C-alpha cells in the first residue's frame, strides 16, 4: 500500500487517496457514457451503445483503404491545426511537427501513434484496427498542440534549467495532451459526431484506467 501511494504521488503529483481516484474514475465513466449517448444520437443511429460500437468496428467507411490514405488524412488534420493554432496558443515553437509512419519493424507491436519533439508517428500497420473517427483526437494528442509541439517548445526554453526542459512528468505531459483532445472542439476540428465520439472514446480509456488501476492494486479485485 505504501509503495502504491508513492506511485500515485509520483504520477499524479498530489497526495490523493486511491479511493478518491477510484471515485473520480467512476464519475468520469458515467459522465462520458452519457456524452457518448448524445454523440451517438447525433449520428442518427438508433441502437444501443454496444451496437453502435459494433457498427463502428465493421463499417468500411471508418477505415483507410491504404497506408497513404491514412497518412494523408493525418497530414490534413495537422494542416488544419496550423491554420488556427495561433488563436489558441500564444507562443509557438520554432520546430515544426514532422509526420512519419511508424517504422515497419516496430509497427506490429507499436501504438496507434506517438508524439515527440517535433515528431508525429502514425501506425499504418493493420489498417482495420486504425479507425478514422479517432484520428483527429489522436493527432491533436500526439502532434500539435499535443506532445509534438509541447516537447519541442520545452526544449527551446533555454532560460530554464535542463531538468525542467527535459524531465517527463506524466500528470503534466499526458494531462496537456488530453486537454488538447478536448481543445479540438473549440478549434472546430471535429467535423462529424463520429469524430466527436472518437474523442470521447479516448477520454473513456483514461477514465477506465483510473477505475481499473485502483481496483486491481488497492481494492483487491
Tell what function each PLM region has:
Residues 1-221:
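N-terminal maturation segment of proteins
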